[in-house]
Curated annotation (Swiss-Prot):
Family annotation (PROSITE patterns): ALDEHYDE_DEHYDR_CYS (PS00070), ALDEHYDE_DEHYDR_GLU (PS00687)
Residues given in the record as K(+) 2 binding sites: L246, K457, G460
Keywords, sorted A to Z: Metal-binding, NAD, NADP, Oxidation, Oxidoreductase, Potassium
Positions where Cysteine sulfenic acid (-SOH) occurs in the chain: C286
UniProt EC number: 1.2.1.8
Site (Seems to be a necessary countercharge to the potassium cations): E248
Subunit note: Dimer of dimers.
Residues involved in NAD(+) binding: G150, A151, W152, K176, P177, S178, E179, G230, V231, E232, T233, G254, C286, E387
Active site (UniProt): K162, E252, C286, E464
Cofactor annotation remark: Binds 2 potassium ions per subunit.
Enzymatic reactions: betaine aldehyde + NAD(+) + H2O = glycine betaine + NADH + 2 H(+)
Listed name of the protein: Betaine aldehyde dehydrogenase
Top-level taxon of the source organism: Bacteria
Organism in which the protein naturally occurs: Acinetobacter baumannii (strain SDF)
Length: 490
């Protein structure tokens, strides 16, 4: 324990001692070892972070957009220079394979920051003539202090997705990382400071989600909450934000996304996409296509192709460069996923491969769950209806296009969806009827910085990434100007 580093809060450009006197540990899910101890924020610390953010935001907003853009671009450069170091830390904290964190997590987060750094100078109002002597113009002004609440599956990427548009628009952000995977958010704060961000513009307060989340969502100074996490928690955050000061919210919540394989699909391509849509990041992706609909006439061939590919997955030490499937991010989450797998068996689904915990050799020390594929599934099963957030694929047979569209939409979620077909007209016809915010045709999973992402129904409110998101970190002020005489009416 003496060798374990203790991490403080990051407020006003430096590490500061938390006042709560409480700490919690970050656990390496590959072996159960403690990798860091973190101090937990108190309500007093939240107040300090808010005051700091208010001070820093005034300085930041007073800078020109070009100055803000240059600082954010410097942060991008530092992120890319330190990519491998950050990826190793992310792997230690999350259990995700280094082959993934080194090529995706930091890379895509930096891409989003670069995108919004470029848009900082494009924030502008408009001027509209009303008559010869009068016109009005608009200004897009920053909201002020905003808060981001992150999830545990993509810690640094989520921190960047939330902070990039907020900072580009001239706001300050207080960020609360998941207590399960808090380490890289602190590194990001260091990088922002190194790049020249004024003190207080990006503060990190870690600790128990329920307490800190409530303090942030109810704080009268904070103007917006951007939250990523589960549906039930999201509802509470949204209600609290509305009940306090009518804060604007962005909610990126859960999913149970359908992947529809059409009868004309190339089965090799379809199987590749299905495996990617279920087992990337050990299945811990909110957009996973966990309900895989396949024509009954092609079920046997598709199932065979999927099993062949799952057998090629390399489970192991996430730091090993050839590993492409690591442990789940925590031991409690592993138990939750295993309970879903058992319920699938009990409800009559057939295990084609996997179906339990990986216990061979050193894997027994970690939170490893075997990539699992179920067939003979029905729409009423828990594994088909509920978000598992783990490496569990459910294959469902169907007969007609109308049937599969109805079944795909028969869910409270609406985050993502996909179609695999060689008929592009059919692809668009199906996708246009699917109730989901992020859709893919003949591919799965890519979320470029330019593309807005978010859900329908209970999968979320608002969008992240893309041009539309930037506007939600500003407010519009309208100003009418009269150049002529003013005629009173009283």
């Amino acid at each position: 324990m003496s060798d374990v580093q203790v991490h403080q809060l990051y407020i006003h450009g430096r590490y500061v001692e938390a006042t709560s006197g409480k700490t919690f540990n970050s656990i390496n899910p590959a072996n159960g070892e403690i990798i860091a101890t973190l101090q937990q924020a108190s309500e007093q610390d939240i107040e300090a972070a808010v005051k700091s953010a208010q001070q820093g935001q005034k300085i930041w907003a007073a800078m020109t957009a070009m100055e803000r853009s240059r600082i954010l671009r410097r942060a991008v450069d530092i992120l890319r220079e330190r990519n491998d170091e950050l990826a190793r830390l992310e792997t230690l904290d999350t259990g995700k394979a280094y082959s993934e964190t080194s090529t995706v997590d930091i890379v895509t987060g930096a891409d989003v920051l670069e995108y919004y750094a470029g848009l900082a100078t494009a924030i502008q109002g408009e001027q509209v003539p009303l008559r010869e002597s009068s016109f009005f113009y608009t200004r897009r002004e920053p909201l002020g202090v905003v808060a981001g609440i992150g999830a545990w599956n993509y810690p640094i990427q989520i921190a960047l997705w939330k902070s990039a548009p907020a900072l580009a628009a001239g706001n300050a952000m207080i960020f609360k990382p998941s207590e399960t995977t808090p380490l890289t958010a602190l590194k990001l704060a260091e990088i922002y400071t190194e790049a020249g961000l004024p003190d207080g513009v990006f503060n990190v307060v870690q600790g128990a989600g329920r307490e800190i989340g409530q303090w942030l969502t109810e704080h009268p100074v904070i103007e917006k909450i951007s939250f990523t996490g589960g549906v039930e928690t999201g509802k509470k955050v949204m209600a609290s934000a509305a009940g306090s000061t009518l804060k604007e919210v962005t909610m990126e919540l859960g999913g149970k996304s359908p992947l529809i394989i059409c009868e004309d699909a190339d089965l090799n391509r379809a199987a590749d996409i299905a495996v990617m849509a279920n087992f990337f990041s050990s299945g811990q992706v909110c957009t996973n296509g966990t309900r895989v609909f396949v024509p009954k006439s092609r079920l046997a061939d598709f199932e065979k192709a999927v099993v062949e590919r799952v057998k090629r997955i390399l489970i192991g030490d996430p730091m090993a460069e050839d590993t492409n499937f690591g442990p789940l991010t925590s031991f409690p989450h592993m138990e939750k996923v295993l309970s879903f797998i058992e319920s699938g068996k009990q409800q009559g689904a057939k295990v084609l491969i996997g179906g339990g915990r990986a216990t061979e050799g050193e894997l027994a020390k970690g939170a490893y769950v075997l990539p699992t594929v179920f067939s003979d599934c029905t729409d009423q099963m828990a594994i088909v209806q509920e978000e598992i957030f783990g490496p569990v694929m459910s294959i469902l047979g169907y007969e007609t296009e109308e049937e599969v569209i109805q079944r795909a939409n028969d869910t409270t979620f609406g985050l993502a969806a996909g179609v695999v077909t060689q008929d592009i007209s059919r692809a668009h016809r199906i996708i246009h009827q699917i109730e989901a915010g992020i859709c893919w045709i003949n591919t799965w999973g890519e979320s470029p910085a330019e593309m807005p992402v978010g859900g329908y129904k209970q999968s979320g409110v608002g969008r992240e990434n893309g041009l539309t998101t930037l506007g939600h970190y500003t407010r519009i002020k309208s100003i009418q100007v009269e150049l002529g005489d003013y005629q009173g009416i009283f």
